[in-house]
Design a protein with these regions (language model features):
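Helix-start (N-cap) detector for alpha-helical repeat units in TPR-like alpha-solenoids
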Residues: 55-56, 89-90, 123-124, 152
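Register position in tetratricopeptide repeats
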Residues: 33-34, 67-68, 101-102, 135, ...
Length: 195
């Protein structure tokens, strides 16, 4: 074997045997799926240092911040995403869920209406909007009863709404971290991930 052939063989063998570097976004997605949110946040920040406008990484960072109960920071991330990529429905949906958790139902409603406007067939946003309307109805019936505690119709409606809310569980479904492969892309809205 010639020296040149030997060098070529060694080079080929080293390429075949060396571990393949994984995609940084795939690494981030894996960390999120595994619930390693602190590490995922570090990875997201690292990726964003070189790709600050990457919608998918920014979205995942918002999800991670939500999971870390850093709601104010998550809201800021999703809000900025809605400004930079207004055609993406998922940031609006997750923003609405965070607002709903803070009982800011009017803000949640507006965000969900924007999600639906950008992607009319986004079933999760429609479901979440229904939950918000139920919460708003509950508030309205509470107010009616505060003004007139003998209003039997309002009492009955409030009881129905409260029963519906308790059966349905917590308001709002974010785009969950499990289906991160469906995180938004900058050029078109992603199909709503199943939750």
């Amino acid at each position: 074997m010639s020296k040149r052939a030997l060098v070529a063989s060694l080079l080929l063998a080293s390429l075949i045997c060396s571990p393949v570097r994984a995609d940084p976004i795939q690494d981030l997605q894996t960390l999120v799926k595994q619930g390693q949110f602190s590490q995922a946040l570090e990875r997201a920040d690292s990726i964003l240092a070189s790709k600050p406008r990457d919608a998918q990484v920014r979205f995942l960072k918002g999800v991670v911040l939500s999971e870390l109960n850093r709601s104010a920071e998550a809201i800021a991330v999703f809000q900025k995403l809605t400004e930079d990529f207004p055609e993406l429905p998922e940031p609006y949906n997750n923003l609405a869920v965070l607002y709903a958790q803070q009982r800011q139902y009017d803000k949640a409603r507006i965000a969900l209406e924007m999600a639906i406007r950008t992607h009319p067939s986004y079933a999760t946003a429609h479901e979440n909007l229904g939950d918000i309307y139920a919460r708003l109805a509950s508030q309205a019936y509470d107010k009616a009863l505060a003004l007139d505690s003998s209003n039997v119709a309002a009492q009955n409606k409030l009881a129905l709404i409260r029963e519906m809310i308790s059966v349905a569980g917590k308001p709002g479904r974010p785009v969950a971290p499990a289906p991160v492969a469906a995180a938004p892309q900058a050029n078109k809205p992603a199909a709503p991930p199943p939750v």
